[in-house]
């Protein structure tokens, strides 16, 4: 079994957490939390990290086996199978939502005349091939994407800081505290980070000497910094009212800058940051779902499921919502509660295992 190192996992978690959130969920959280969005992201990051650590604690109970296999020893086979199907369904639902975000983004900004179905099929083919390549390929992709993102951010940050920002607004982050808005924003941000509980499903691929708590903390911290690096400038450039009504406030912020006559806009560079990172996230979600389904079906090789499951994700993404506004409303109003319910399921296993005592995650000796 090929293993993932600690540094690879940090990069993978960083890209996985920040990619979609920085690109598409900035506007919803600004609309919800206003100036309290920064605090909401920080609190959400801490709570989401606790969810991830709970999932990792369950995975450590049987480090050599997949959660889809050893979970039945904890709660029983007929309880475990419906729960693992729920979790696999959630991950595929999440992958479909992310893919729909990519489709809408490309259609609005770069491919307005291309049929959505064509874009979805091409994205699905990319995901299927990535999933078939295995977790090691996904981890190596994360390394490349991480350093490309880091390089572009280093290059673009000085240029973007040249845009006039309303720096007096910084005081509002402290003076405009609202408990209700902060709580609502925290509820919305927590599943952003809690989504990294996917590590539970790939734990056997991690090197055994990895200190998972330290890795998860660094992944959450790095992704939090990256998300805030998009969120704060968007707030200072447009204010909470206007930024909350924009579909892609970060894109509008970048478009407001011109560099002489040879680069009219920097938004293609932003696309370079978004799309590969999001495809990595979708691929990891599909991989985790496929590997779990393969174990439930007692398949020795998960690869035959890669194309069929990816095709299902493509079909669902096309019919996920009628338009971008409806998609944003779903992500703001309904998805956080649904996501938290799914992400908290591993905690049920943790409680049952603690009650049953040591060895609960291993088969009983005959």
Where are these regions (language model features)?
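Hydrophobic, membrane-embedded alpha-helices of multi-pass small-molecule transporters
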Residues: 6-24, 40, 44, 87-91, ...
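Membrane helical hairpin/interfacial module
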Residues: 22-116, 125
């Amino acid at each position: 079994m090929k293993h993932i190192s600690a540094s690879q996992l940090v990069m993978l978690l960083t890209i996985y957490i920040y990619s979609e959130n920085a690109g598409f969920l900035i506007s919803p959280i600004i609309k919800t939390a206003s100036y309290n969005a920064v605090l909401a992201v920080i609190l959400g990051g801490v709570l989401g990290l606790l969810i991830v650590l709970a999932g990792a604690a369950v995975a450590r109970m049987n480090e050599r086996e997949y959660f889809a296999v050893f979970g039945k020893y904890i709660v029983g086979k007929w309880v475990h199978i419906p729960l693992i199907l729920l979790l696999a369904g959630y991950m595929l639902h999440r992958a479909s939502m992310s893919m729909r975000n990519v489709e809408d983004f490309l259609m609005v900004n770069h491919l307005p005349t291309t049929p959505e179905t064509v874009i979805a099929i091409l994205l699905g083919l990319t995901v299927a091939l990535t999933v078939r390549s295995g977790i090691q390929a996904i981890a190596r992709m994360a390394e490349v994407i991480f350093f490309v993102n880091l390089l572009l951010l280093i290059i673009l940050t000085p240029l973007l800081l040249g845009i006039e920002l309303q720096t007096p607004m910084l005081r509002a982050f402290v003076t405009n505290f609202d408990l209700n808005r902060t709580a609502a924003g925290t509820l919305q941000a927590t599943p952003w980070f809690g989504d990294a509980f996917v590590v539970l499903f790939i734990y056997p691929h991690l090197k055994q000497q990895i200190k998972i708590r330290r890795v998860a903390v660094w992944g959450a911290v790095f992704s939090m910094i990256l998300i805030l690096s998009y969120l704060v400038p968007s707030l200072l450039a447009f204010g909470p009212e206007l930024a909350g009504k924009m579909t892609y406030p970060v894109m509008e912020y970048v478009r407001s800058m011109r560099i002489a006559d040879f680069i009219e806009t920097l938004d293609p560079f932003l696309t370079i940051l978004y799309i590969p990172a999001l495809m990595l996230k979708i691929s990891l979600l599909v991989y985790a779902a496929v590997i779990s389904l393969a174990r439930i079906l007692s398949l020795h090789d998960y690869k035959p499921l890669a194309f069929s499951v990816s095709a299902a994700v493509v079909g669902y993404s096309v019919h996920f919502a009628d338009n971008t506004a409806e998609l944003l409303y779903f992500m703001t109003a309904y998805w956080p509660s649904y996501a938290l319910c799914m992400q908290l399921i591993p905690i049920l296993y943790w409680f049952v295992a603690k009650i049953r005592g040591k060895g609960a995650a291993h088969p009983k000796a005959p």
